[in-house]
């Protein structure tokens, strides 16, 4: 498959995928997928089992396609996966400090936690948190990281309506300055995020 550096395109496009194919044995998962993604939200949309997560992993360089071209995807990514992968013994700021390293800024971290409705929980170890709170912390970590693009695999799973709205607003803010690739099977959030939809 082909790969290249960032590309410049109309509307600030920074990555382009052409005729991407991937199969596991005799089972085709992705067939001739093509799209461009620039600043804003690009949603990989479709029901379970159509290859959304596989495509995201290919963009991140975690899997290789069988054929096709990837241009502009060799950038610094931050991500939320389906598993949150948090340090259970640390509190919110401890998790962010560890993950972000020299990029950690406490004022920005505190502001992001406030935006996501997590301020009163910041002193508790993550092991005492609910699944929805952990999900929001994982999102905070990805959005605070210094990156060129953000990959989000079902980031709003397990959130109630109020906290889902908080999370969507934070994602929308990030998408004003960089590409956000969002995996989802729920169309309700796509209008709010003004997403360009890739149907799989």
Where do the model's predicted regions map?
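ABC-family nucleotide-binding domains
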Residues: 153, 160
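Q-loop/switch helix immediately C-terminal to the Walker
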Residues: 89-104, 108
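Helix-to-loop junction immediately C-terminal to a conserved catalytic motif
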Residues: 60
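Conserved ABC ATPase signature
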Residues: 125-133
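Walker B catalytic motif
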Residues: 125, 154-155
